[in-house]
Amino acid sequence: MGKLCVIDGLDGCGKSTQLEQIRARLAAMGVDFREISFPDYEQPSSALVKQYLAGEFGEDASPFAASSFYAVDRYASFQKFWKEDYEAGKLIVAARYTTSNAIYQLARSPRETWDAFLDWMEDYEYEKLGLPRPDAVCFLDMPLAVSQRLMTERYDGDESKKDLHERNVKFLETCREAALYAAKRWGWTVIPCGEGDKPFSIEAVTESLMEWLKPFV
């Protein structure tokens, strides 16, 4: 089997920028790898995810139902697009994965049920659906003040373009708490991406990511 390394983080943390940097670095090193990203909006398997984020199921959709929407998208992607590469031993670098359910949907669950939700998620995605467990996960920890500013810039100041999750700052604060909770339980690497209202340089974060990836390349 190959190695599956997952980069996750809240919206506006700089995942896309860092993936560009990592792609260039790994290519220059001659590393044979496959890059994947979730949700896979270009595929029909993401249809329910799109409806959920557009608010078509309301703002109180069951976190178990929402988790299933994302999980099915990942299952389809694995079976159709990267299972062969993974089983052939290739390095897979994922932007988001099962880990996002352990952030966004955990945050939508009562805090006293967090351990039970994570137990359910592990059994559902890895055992029942048969998705590969990540070999390593890093969480890009960008201060919310910075990520909100970056998202506003991304949408040219049009707040209406933000999805169900992106526009709820209080929810995103809980998402960060959930991410750090999952990180502690599952041994994720947390990479700070800024301090206060200032982001760290792109290069500094890339160096931290490459150090994290070193055992797999």
Language-model features, listed with the residues they occupy:
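Pre-Walker A (Motif I) flank of P-loop NTPase domains
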Residues: M1-L4
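Hydrophobic anchor at the beta1->P-loop junction of P-loop NTPases
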Residues: I7
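P-loop (Walker A) phosphate-binding loop of NTP-binding proteins
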Residues: L10
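Conserved lysine of the Walker
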Residues: K15
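ATP-dependent small-molecule kinase phosphotransfer cores
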Residues: M29-L129
